């Protein structure tokens, strides 16, 4: 994430209608340092095994223990590195910072000499040993889809955090993972089980680090979906009520089937939805993997439609990103940033298909689908104008101008426009589905990422040879407003817009183990004038606790649009509880309403039906 990666997709529940009033984000780091260029290449290694230990004792220390063993054929130094980021969470996270007590041993448990080459690389000298083991503890105290997090009875960890790789030796090596934990605890992962209990195999490093683990006490249930099993692993136990779980098991297999129709196949057998619900977490976030995804959510979202939309988004990533992705991201490079101009396709069009697959599966109706599209239109209209390609590139530095994740809604809307234009040009005989299916075959199936030439070539071919150079120049590389007055009637849709006034508090927060941490305060805002500072913990607004159910909607109702009204905040600053107050700031926002046009032409009605039902 990483988000508020929305993927990392993050939906900021506590900020849904108050942005930028309250914006909930996960911990982020500046993408400043990069690995020193010219790091020493490792000597070859083989027979790689990782052992992860998490039990009651390590849980008490909020850590896990990691051991990596491998064979060497010479005394040449072995250089081991830990990734700096997790694919899908487009930010540098410096996972090596949580390594504690690194050590190395050789044959006969003999201590070996080692040193550090840079911030995330260690050099080990075998000194005659044929098999080497390195080990360390790893701090697991960050509630983040791309990180490691523990409780007295539970652990989430990502392979990118804890599995070193031999520098410069490529990523095609196989590896085995063994989990050591309490006898009564469970393990959940998408990794292929080995022959021994709690042993798992990966054919290469990319697969190895794309399979997060749950270890401990959590619910684990399954149902048939596609050609395998859909498993839901949920922490804490009992966090998903029976009615919500039943709805998930009814809806998600249908969503998977609809998404599979787009690409012509379901590329995974079993799929594991891994979810953490935490009352101190004020958002919803998801991070995709090739046959699983990890959600972190406020308990208030469980059973709500917004959470199902996150599920649909992350599952669609199993095709779009985890398999079909831009050449800029093929293969993944784990030590530095990997910027691309294509996140509007990888994330934005994924978001479009999250909505499409839900309406096509009958999970939502057409009215709800149109509402979801209209919300994206409003979000884009209320944000600064930015080119899709520029927004995609900038995500690594988390712009503070309100565009850090704009490629999600704006990219989704670009997908809608392309879909409508293709259907209109082909008399509804082709669609964006054809583009996705063709790119999937031409890129992923041939072991490579797609290029801009391939993307626009596929779009043009689906539209019968129509040129999209002007579309690209104005709406992808450029910052022109989307031409809804000409696009929407082609699909039998009608748009209206209203200007509304909403309260703006001007504080950006992040949920952590201590509560709702203030990350940034906008100068001249309600919170800024009240004297709130980054590092404060926000406890309540006008006496209403931030942990209360329906906090955002109730806060909006309470504050109304009374510009200048006195607003009080209770915050914790260090050991002190302080009451702050400031005048309410109010801003204008555009609200959009999208409906089916009863006067649409027969062709437009066919196109609208094609969008909603996946038919031609």
Predicted stretch roles:
Residues 354-355, 364-616:
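C-terminal recognition in membrane/secretory proteostasis and scaffolding
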Residues 293, 298, 323-324, 335-386, ...:
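Post-HExxH zinc-binding segment in Zn-dependent metallohydrolases
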Residues 56-57, 61, 88-151:
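A surface-exposed beta-strand-loop module
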Residues 10-21:
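Bacterial N-terminal signal peptides
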Residues 127, 135-217:
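Extended, low-hydrophobicity, Ser/Thr/Pro/Gly-biased non-transmembrane segments
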Residues 26-59:
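N-terminal, polar/Ser/Thr-rich
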Residues 91, 95-101, 161, 168, ...:
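Zn2+-dependent metallopeptidase catalytic core
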Residues 68, 219-343:
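Juxtacatalytic substrate-recognition/specificity segment
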